[in-house]
């Protein structure tokens, strides 16, 4: 789940905790950078500080809402008086956390927001004998839990969302890695290789097919129709 974090003082540990929780995090420190990032990528959730070097984060969020963007937004700030909190929610924020932030609470609140934002449709993805809960980050094959490492789980999620269709390599890389990450040239291939191992060992009735020069597609195996 790709996240835009607009802040200047959150520690690397917070970003690491979000990564461990299944969030690919892009970190920027100004509203100008936030606008550039927001309009060049697709984000599932925003984390926003109020006081930024080039303006008020609340004004920026207010403009997004007036332009029709409904992506969930969590405000994080040391400013915590009642009037400010009321202003935060009246400006279109979905949640507020006072700094210093507990990463466990932050992740729990983010997942709750994402769960509510997707409740109009069933969040469970089913393909063959595999079930995936994108909010709980849980995978099962024939009802048996399948533990998959975070990066490979992100690959699986994006392939499942477009099952049966070709997912371009560039699109996968864009969704999997934030622009703050240092990514080796064969990182995606290595992740695909490991994910194929997970699926094969679990008896999943689906496979990842390489479309040379383009990307990858997730398809059912012959066993799924036997």
Swiss-Prot record:
SUPFAM superfamilies xrefs: CheY-like (SSF52172)
Gene Ontology BP, a term: regulation of DNA-templated transcription
Recorded GO MF terms: phosphorelay response regulator activity; transcription cis-regulatory region binding
DNA-binding region(s) in UniProt: 122-220
Signal peptide as annotated in the record: none
Main localization of the protein described in the UniProt heading: cytoplasm
InterPro entries membership: CheY-like_superfamily, OmpR/PhoB-type_DNA-bd, Sig_transdc_resp-reg_receiver, WalR-like, WH-like_DNA-bd_sf
Cell location: Cytoplasm
Span of domain Response regulatory: 1-114
Keywords: Cytoplasm, DNA-binding, Phosphoprotein, Plasmid, Transcription, Transcription regulation, Two-component regulatory system
Cellular component, GO annotation: cytosol; protein-DNA complex
Site entry: Ancestral phosphorylation site: 49
PANTHER family linked: REGULATOR OF RPOS, TRANSCRIPTIONAL REGULATORY PROTEIN CUTR
UniProt-recorded name of the protein: Probable transcriptional regulatory protein y4xI
Organism name: Sinorhizobium fredii (strain NBRC 101917 / NGR234)
Lineage: Bacteria, Pseudomonadati, Pseudomonadota, Alphaproteobacteria, Hyphomicrobiales
